[in-house]
Amino acid sequence: MALFITCRKEWLGSIWAKEKIGNLTNAASRRRIKYYFFYSTDELEMYRDVYESEPSCIVLLSNGGESERRLVSMFKELPMPLIVFGDHKYESISNEISYVMSDTADLTSRILDIFKKKGCKYPAVVGMVSTGQMDSLKIEQFKKMDYSGRGLVFDTESGKLSEAVEKLFKSSEPVDSIICSNDLQAICLIKIFDMVDPDWNKRLLLASYGNTTLVSQTSPSVTTGDFGFDSGSEQVIRIYRTLISGAGVSAMHTIMRHGFIERESTATQSPEGIVFSEKVTPKTETIKESVRRYKKAEKIEKILLGADAVDYRVIRGLMKGEKITDIADDAYCSPGTIKYRIKKYKETVGLAKTAEFSALLNELIDYKKIINH
């Protein structure tokens, strides 16, 4: 039994791909299913002996778009079932290809339900990429479901969050609740809102999609919808075992069991809202500097995704400025082991000095929240 996992190579660096791959390989390992990675038909050819000698399947990790359709057309002619481990609900579903999908419509609906119950009258979307497949779908869903009837969207065509933020600060429309594309965007917006109004979270509720590890440790922690990649991975395995069982099934289509986590970023009841055009607009460079937190946050999230108990002990120690020997004693490790881990962290985020890395941790993480790990 073997899975052959593929995706666009340029997508491998994203935290969403890392989470999907981690969940999928863990699910396969638990069932002693072998897995291989490939990125072209030539690379797959190297494993011909494997997929011709034992029941096998291709799993395409997808985030939508034209490139996905090209990959599907490339692989669906191969002598193996194809499962698309996607991110969203497909408009049309093939009877020849299996899909595991996220239902962003339900997540959007649940966010708006929470806003409505909290007494929010003026929801808006901020920062979504209008030209992106996933974000354009979320925007469309929001406009259909927005109970205020405004369908207020501050998006970006270029993919630059700063463009959307500048649109927001030009708006004379009141906003009392915001949905952004993902958690890391939310972390950037928190920084900008903090500069404009330290009490913004009493006037405005914030929610996003993704449920990253990092966003649960920020202040305030953002309310998020979890796409359910862990559930999706289990369903990929279930589909695979059904397809190879000889049950006469050519394809299966399932929806991931997502979750929703409400946090203090939606704790305020009946927020009064903010008219951003009445606020002092941060300078363009200030906005861009805040938005640069996205890349920093993404790199910290990569560390947290693979973190064990020792990693969390090291991170807490660095945030408090503890000596390496003290961290090592408390973690029951040698100082050399702790130094090696810190070296790997700095390589991940692209920093040379430990003090710089410690400062970054304190910038993004609330120490009071991370001590629970």
Where are the regions that the model predicts?
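Alpha-helical recognition/docking segments in bacterial nutrient-uptake
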Residues: 1-113, 170
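Periplasmic-binding protein-like
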Residues: 3-7, 54-63, 81-83, 124-128, ...
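Flexible loop/turn connectors
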Residues: 27-28, 96-97, 104, 172-180, ...
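Hydrophobic alpha-helical segments within soluble ligand-binding/sensing domains
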Residues: 89, 98-126, 160-166, 186, ...
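An alpha-beta-alpha
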Residues: 109-149, 252-267
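Linker/hinge segments immediately adjacent to helix-turn-helix/homeobox DNA-binding domains
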Residues: 238-306, 366-373
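Helix-turn-helix DNA-binding segment
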Residues: 295-337
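Basic, Lys/Arg-enriched C-terminal extension of HTH/homeodomain DNA-binding domains
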Residues: 342-373
